[in-house]
């Protein structure tokens, strides 16, 4: 693959007038290899070289009036775009900012900023429980371990270095006094690039926030092209932040504002353009995936399969519940955060033998930046188009109340129809791990998906809700056995019972049928 990329880049160079000597270096990074050296050589990764020349689809689009610049204009996009993106995504090391996470081991020191009072204090959790979740995130990555944890109080978590001078110095002394520490996980939503840089310089180790740790758990668990594309899109803010830091460092050395190869562009402008082109390609590819999803969704609608989306906090037992409801032995649930990153569909039957589609979704997590969730918006679109939602909760988890609030907050931001939210069934899973809770709400059911407790009641409630939400009715129809009526009903409805009346060659058929299908039946056979 590397030789192919090199040859393509070199061929392009033949038609380009270079004012600087270009030293080709085989790097996967978009910008980490870009260095202007004192000898005048400019080191550029091959993927970047390819973007400079007129053979790039980016420049072809600009030549022809920019009609390709709109992501929604899928009919004008050549398959070259998707092939290019898939080629770059074949290796998981998509960016230098996060590549080091997945290479080798890390001995992590978890630091949790504890806000004692004020609007920033978490009212639904405790510092100890939040540290426990942070540790679970660390253990989700291979060869990562937790060396120690520390809860450090802070009055101003939004300040530049999170902590006051005294606490920050204490923290610095602790980290430097333990050479076995190779990384610090600061348990906050997102650190600015400047804060991250200053902390790394002060402590001498890598510093991660929840965004980078969760993003790399996603990368480790991503197996499909769609998941990798979504993660590549979510990585772009990190790439841009690192670019600012690197450019600032080069400016101090007098190289950041130097024009490159006589192109009239500075280093920063080149990198910004490369990142923009990368973003365009990824979004184009995701639009293609989205179009395929819409096609599948349309086919389901034509066949009138009810769609039931299973959602909930990460590791709440969603996949285990789907396995229990469908009997699909091919499903292999894992006791792991973010084990599911792709939406998968699974056929099942309700007690009335009506076929339905259960949709397994990505798990939610508290304190995730909006743009990380937004990168998976195409995946979550299946939730919006559901006929019924089932919210699975790990009722045995000490933070189950906070987890519920986090899930409901995300659902609210998705802009779901209010009727879909009002009819959502809440499933309190893992009751085998605690004393049986007492439910007072009709829409709340207690189950153990692993051991099968409460599943029959759940199936009945799901059936009732689906019948109501999809406008299905139980109808008894008299059919002529010599006509195609019965075979039509088997195809277009859910046949419950057939009572043959041999004396007149007819049968009474009890079916579950939608209003639209019943209208078609009457039009065909009741003239």
Curated annotation (Swiss-Prot):
One of its GO terms (molecular function) is GTP binding. Residues 306-470 form the Hflx-type G domain. Mg(2+) binds at residues 319, 340. GO terms for cellular component: cytoplasm. Disulfide bonds: none annotated. This is Putative GTP-binding protein 6. PROSITE patterns: G_HFLX. Pfam families: GTP-bdg_M, GTP-bdg_N, MMR_HSR1. Keywords: GTP-binding, Magnesium, Metal-binding, Nucleotide-binding.
